[in-house]
A protein has these predicted regions:
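Asp-box/BNR beta-propeller blade signature and adjacent active/binding-site loops
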Residues: 1-348
Length: 348
């Protein structure tokens, strides 16, 4: 499988003054090859002025960003866009911190020009239900699968939320993981954001006691056979598999891909072909560069690096990837000051 980069653009004007920091983008394709991209932004991650912002890509140009979800004094996080039958869904988290965030959803029937009032995704449930970072999977049986996770002060755990009625109700299915005590953490090659207080939690003793997996990226290899690849605290990506449309999962297990405890995303192209965007770096909270694209032709058993999107020191993180025909659309965080968009063409 061959990949070629055809477009690389900043979503925001260079040197903009819309906000101090931006992070965690999501991308969705509308009919006619048009795109919508959302992210959270404000003074810094976790600050009360963070909001969800949206930009449109049409005829090769990005629109000025607009703020589409905000509430003064309440941190907003990790938007996920989903397009279904003429309706644009926006899922996102709100809360004082990640341990206590909850999920809200808004809908647009005019491609993001206007939005419904926010509502809880699962009324009465204070857990962070629904998608946590990566896109929904619409399975072959028509059900929606939302890759999800929860983080407390010690343990990180992934799960999926399943909807048989197109997002009206959700059923939670856990992904098993045996937790262990975190190992020793060398301070070399750490992500610079830890030193610069870019993370919502600045107590590094607490940060390094977290153990587990979060932020799954999901695909269906054949009807009912569903898989997730997950970020971990353990220096490698973890995987879990299901044979019953995501209702039951095997114990999560490490695969032969490094992970720096930062988000990844992948897309399934059929016939066992997968394209993954990730930081090929091993270590807990290690540096967030380079940013690379890897390919698999055997449903994730083996991987080969195909492209490097960013090589210089910096933070290039939290990628999102979707497929639209033979084009792959990728967005990612650029030093928390911008969002980069890349178009890749695949063949073979």
């Amino acid at each position: 499988m061959r990949l070629t980069t055809t477009t690389r653009q900043y979503v925001l004007p260079e040197g903009h003054d819309y906000f101090g920091n931006c992070h965690a983008s999501t991308v969705v394709a509308l009919p006619g090859g048009r795109l919508r991209v959302a992210w959270f932004a404000g003074e810094k991650e976790g600050s009360g002025d963070t909001a969800i912002w949206l930009a449109s890509h049409e005829q090769g140009r990005w629109s000025p960003p607009v703020r589409v979800a905000w509430e003064d004094g309440l941190a907003h996080w990790n938007p996920v866009l989903h397009w279904q039958a003429g309706t644009l869904w926006l899922f996102y988290k709100v809360g004082a911190d990640v341990h206590h965030w909850q999920t809200r959803v808004q809908l647009s029937t005019d491609e993001g020009a206007s939005w419904s009032a926010p509502r809880p995704l699962v009324p009465g449930d204070s857990a962070p239900r629904g998608p946590v970072k990566n896109k929904l999977l619409v399975m072959s049986n028509g059900e929606w699968l939302a890759p999800a996770s929860v983080e407390d002060d010690r343990h990180w755990d992934a799960f999926v939320d399943l909807s048989a009625d197109q997002g009206q109700s959700w059923q939670r299915a856990p992904i098993p993981l045996t937790h262990r005590l975190p190992g020793e953490h060398g301070r070399e090659a750490l992500w610079s954001g830890l030193e610069q207080a870019a993370l919502w939690e600045n107590d590094l003793a607490r940060v390094f006691q977290w153990d587990g997996v979060i932020q799954p990226s999901a695909w269906e290899s054949s009807p009912g056979r569903v898989h997730v690849l997950m970020r971990s605290t353990r220096g490698a990506l973890y995987r879990s598999d299901s044979d019953d449309f995501g209702r039951h999962w095997c114990e999560a297990y490490a695969v032969g891909l490094p992970n720096n405890n930062s988000g990844v995303d992948l897309v399934h192209l059929g016939a066992g072909r997968l394209v993954l965007v990730y930081n090929p770096v091993t270590g807990n909270w290690h540096r967030r560069y380079p940013l690379a694209v890897a390919c698999s032709t055997d449903n994730g058993e083996h991987w080969q690096d195909a492209l490097c999107l960013e090589q210089e020191p910096g933070e290039f993180s939290y990628p999102a990837i979707i497929a639209d025909g033979d084009t792959l659309h990728v967005t990612y965080t650029w030093n928390r000051k911008n969002i980069v968009y890349c178009a890749l063409i695949f063949s073979g």
